[in-house]
Amino acid sequence: MSTSGPITEFPAPGLRDPFRYITGHDAEGNAVFVQTDNGDHRAVMLGGAAAQNIIYSAGSNPIELTGNVDLEFAKNRPSLHIPNGVCVRMIDFAPGCKSNMHRALCMGIGTVCEGEVELTLGSGEKRILRPGDVSINRGAMHQWRNTSDEKPARMLYTLLDIKPLIVNGKQLDFDMGYLMKEYAEYDEGEGDKKAE
């Protein structure tokens, strides 16, 4: 794992700062843009090997839009994933960045936006994902690696809560390894599994 890298802020050098355009309704019921910005809750991760930007979060599913309940919730930094909610997180990976094997107890839908990344599963199976490719991670132990030693990569993850995951009669555990320290200051989103 690369524990240091060239990333000192989001976005990573060489990648554009994405805009988000949040819609809603005005007092007359017309569809309008209610917020245009670059996202909330940015953080450098793993000593500069990656950086994240929380694009959206909501504390319920179905999502409560009336009265902008979701936008009020999103003002607070979310947990890794949100029980009964949704979190959309963009992560930039430094050149050569490689995570440890990890499992979050959520459905992780990951879309490659920039660059090329390798997804390795706990079984050792691997796939290369390119811009536009999507991984649907259903609680699998996995690892990400930016295949380039020269350019950053970017992924967009939508994280949804799941019911307890039982495989071969055994309930699978949350296991983020050393990545958990990146989320330790977050709230109680992952239950009793905290950084050691």
From Swiss-Prot:
Superkingdom to which the source organism belongs: Eukaryota
Residue span, Cupin type-2 domain: 92-156
GO molecular function, one term: oxidoreductase activity
Coiled coil: none
Keyword Oxidoreductase: yes
Classification via SUPFAM superfamilies: RmlC-like cupins
Keywords of the record: Oxidoreductase
Enzyme Commission code: 1.-.-.-
Pfam families, per the entry: Cupin_2
Entries under InterPro entries matching the protein: Cupin_2, OryJ/VirC-like, RmlC-like_jellyroll, RmlC_Cupin_sf
Entry's induction text: Expression is up-regulated during sexual development. Expression is also up-regulated during confrontation with the arthropod fungivore Drosophila melanogaster.
Function: Cupin-domain-containing oxidoreductase; part of the gene cluster that mediates the biosynthesis of sordarial, a salicylic aldehyde structurally related to the phytotoxin pyriculol. The most interesting aspect of this pathway is formation of an aromatic product from the highly reducing polyketide synthase srdA. SrdA synthesizes a reduced polyketide chain from one molecule of acetyl-CoA and five molecules of malonyl-CoA. The polyketide chain is then reductively released as an aldehyde.
Family designation: Belongs to the virC family.
Name of protein: Cupin-domain-containing oxidoreductase srdB
Protein source organism: Neurospora crassa (strain ATCC 24698 / 74-OR23-1A / CBS 708.71 / DSM 1257 / FGSC 987)
Gene of this entry: srdB
